[in-house]
């Protein structure tokens, strides 16, 4: 592709070195993202898009550009930043490399115009493809983590709010909803910001209860809506397709309506009477059994569930539960979280084995 321009007047070594370095940078960043799409997300479409862009970059990476490389004479090889040595979680790793790819493509777009006009156009288009890839990665990660989260902590007012939530996260929790009905908005905003940072540090999803505006303000992973809150379609219009939307349901009609309206997950309950929903009669285990048979999206049994009754809830068909008091009021939230997770994992494993055995006899 570069041969037609081998006699171009723009073959100054500096420009060729810039193009060579940024082609390397973009290809390396794409390979890092591709590996996570392939092995971490098990997403063939996302991994395939990364591979396709790498191959397109390779076509532009001609021998002419490679020959201009002067690593010993590159003053930039000695420039470092402390942040380059640290990656706290996979989200940060991906974000850093996506930014690296986007910056490299912008450099290629601008300097490419001096080397070959077609190069500038090609890399501009690729840069927008990377933006789309980044958005798709966020959506895929959130949905995958939701699917893999059997335990959902819904907070209640507590002087130990942050300590309790962090203890649960240390116990393996991957899904947290901040629920606060009485505090001022300034307090809610401050608490939500801190909880979101904490959740993301531990690789967990952070959901805001009720408030779409606060969910956007703190960059939450989603919002949970009650039956009296705004319609799902309205929330989706504000939040976009990247964020999760959950809906509380108390009966089959509400469940089917929430699914039809596009909820990403639903709450099923209250299973037992609970002060958190003092105005709601218990839906009981019958509703849990109905959800087990009919819910086509992730659902969480919720309402009065604790270590003493979780077996009954699981025996009714639940594989995911949402917990409030049993963790928020626990003396040892980490241990209680681990207990719930062990019970949920045990049931999921048994049902997976039963399903495979059943299929083998078909």
Please state what every model-predicted region is.
Residues 101, 153, 168, 176, ...:
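Conserved, mostly hydrophobic/aromatic
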Residues 179-181, 227-235, 267-279, 310-343:
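Glycine-rich phosphate-binding active-site loops on the catalytic face of alpha/beta enzymes
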Residues 218-225, 246-293:
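Glycine/Thr-rich beta-alpha phosphate-binding loop at enzyme active sites
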Residues 90, 147-162, 243-249, 301:
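Active-site mouth loops of central-metabolism enzymes
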Residues 189-210, 227-250, 279-307, 338-352:
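Alpha-helix-loop-beta-strand connector modules within alpha/beta enzyme cores
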Residues 14-17, 121-124, 128-167, 233, ...:
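N-terminal amphipathic alpha-helix/helix-capping segment at the start of soluble metabolic enzymes
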Residues 156-169, 209-213, 250-257, 306-311:
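Short, acidic/polar
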